């Protein structure tokens, strides 16, 4: 049985079946148009193997070809320049020499311990994808079919995970101290913290914590930043008083974020910020942003099997935003 669909050409159907398709886990990913796709899930270093099945739809016909091959491809595509895709992985297996097909055939393939250095990603301006590509080479028009796969990059617990503690404010008007329990969170983690009001001389009407995602594509003058508010957490609605302490508890699991991705193949980055927003009675907005790291925690079963993962934990420099006045 095939789990990856087929290509209906004029003569034959191209189909791929993974050797472990019955047991391999699948993962979901949102496409650029908001739809959810489900594909087989792989990790860095895992082999990819299976069969390419060519099924003739019209018995008695002949299919001349200049060779048949399968490729494992890792590719980055910038949506504003779709003609300029970049392949960071391209492995090729030749399945058949030039000749002709007169009946259905199957070909085994295996890509051993494939390096998959980045996480699959679809964002506002960029897509990083992995796929198997089967090509029947012909003189005029090749028969081609692509089968998407999803790759997750796993990480071990960071050795250092300091809390974030800062005192910010507006001179002689407002001073607050905020604290988050960690600076690095796994994707199912809970952000725990508190806000303490040291001085309150302006009337605050509303206060919230936002989780902001910034997708940065390109380099130099051609850099584009897409900002998206992933989550909002209302801290308070009403005026605080001096000495008041307000707890924070934000569950990341409900928002399905991606891991932090830094300078992926010199093409793009994905960074996350906690944005503390205050609104006064004159509807003026004050904010303070702090960058955090998000990482993908390995499942218990895989943690026992592996001790080394490619993702490293660094301390990115905070990136100030020019969208609103900062406290």
UniProtKB/Swiss-Prot annotation:
Q: How does it sit in the membrane?
A: Peripheral membrane protein
- Gene3D superfamilies reported in the protein's UniProt record: 2.60.40.640
- BP-aspect Gene Ontology terms: endocytic recycling; intracellular protein transport; retrograde transport, endosome to Golgi
Q: Where is the composition biased (Polar residues)?
A: 316-327
Main location (coarse class): cytoplasm
Task: List every stretch annotated Disordered.
Answer: 306-327
* Domain of life according to the entry: Eukaryota
Q: Which UniProt keywords apply?
A: Cytoplasm, Endosome, Membrane, Phosphoprotein, Protein transport, Transport
Gene Ontology CC: one annotated term: endosome membrane
Q: Name one Pfam family in it.
A: Vps26
Query: Which sequence positions carry the modification called Phosphoserine?
Result: 315
The protein's matches in InterPro entries, at most eight in alphabetical order, are given as: Arrestin-like_C, Vps26-related
**Quaternary arrangement and interactors, per the entry?**
Component of the heterotrimeric retromer cargo-selective complex (CSC), also described as vacuolar protein sorting subcomplex (VPS), formed by VPS26 (VPS26A or VPS26B), VPS29 and VPS35. The CSC has a highly elongated structure with VPS26 and VPS29 binding independently at opposite distal ends of VPS35 as central platform. The CSC is believed to associate with variable sorting nexins to form functionally distinct retromer complex variants.
Q: What does this protein do?
A: Acts as a component of the retromer cargo-selective complex (CSC). The CSC is believed to be the core functional component of retromer or respective retromer complex variants acting to prevent missorting of selected transmembrane cargo proteins into the lysosomal degradation pathway. The recruitment of the CSC to the endosomal membrane involves RAB7A and SNX3. The SNX-BAR retromer mediates retrograde transport of cargo proteins from endosomes to the trans-Golgi network (TGN) and is involved in endosome-to-plasma membrane transport for cargo protein recycling.
Q: What is this protein called?
A: Vacuolar protein sorting-associated protein 26A
Q: What does the record give as the organism's lineage? A: Eukaryota, Metazoa, Chordata, Craniata, Vertebrata
């Amino acid at each position: 049985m095939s789990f990856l669909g087929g290509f209906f050409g004029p003569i034959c159907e191209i189909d791929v079946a993974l050797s472990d398709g019955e047991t391999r886990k699948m993962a979901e990913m949102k496409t650029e148009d908001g739809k959810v796709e489900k594909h087989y899930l792989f990790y860095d270093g895992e082999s990819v193997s299976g069969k390419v099945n060519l099924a003739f739809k019209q018995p008695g016909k002949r299919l001349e070809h200049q060779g048949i091959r399968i490729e494992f491809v890792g590719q980055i595509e910038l949506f504003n320049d779709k003609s300029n895709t970049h392949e960071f992985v391209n492995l090729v297996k030749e399945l058949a020499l030039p000749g002709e097909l007169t009946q259905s055939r199957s070909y085994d393939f295996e890509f051993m311990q494939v390096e998959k250095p980045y996480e699959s990603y679809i964002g506002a301006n960029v897509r990083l994808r992995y796929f198997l590509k089967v090509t029947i080479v012909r003189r005029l028009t090749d028969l081609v079919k692509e089968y998407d796969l999803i790759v997750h990059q796993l990480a071990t617990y960071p050795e250092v995970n300091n809390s974030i503690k800062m005192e910010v404010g507006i001179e002689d008007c407002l001073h607050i101290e905020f604290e988050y329990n960690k600076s690095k969170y796994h994707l199912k983690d809970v952000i725990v913290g508190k806000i303490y009001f040291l001085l309150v001389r302006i009337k605050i009407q509303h206060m919230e914590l936002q989780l902001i995602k910034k997708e940065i594509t390109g380099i130099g003058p051609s850099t584009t930043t897409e900002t998206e508010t992933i989550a909002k957490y209302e801290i308070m609605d009403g005026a605080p008083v001096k000495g008041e302490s307000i707890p924070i508890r934000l569950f990341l699991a409900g928002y399905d974020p991606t891991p932090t991705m830094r300078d992926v193949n010199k093409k793009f980055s994905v960074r996350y910020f906690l944005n503390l927003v205050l609104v006064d009675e004159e509807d003026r907005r004050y904010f303070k942003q702090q960058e955090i790291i998000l990482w993908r925690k390995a499942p218990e079963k895989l943690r026992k099997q592996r001790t080394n993962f490619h993702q490293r934990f660094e301390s990115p420099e905070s990136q100030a935003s020019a969208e609103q006045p900062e406290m």
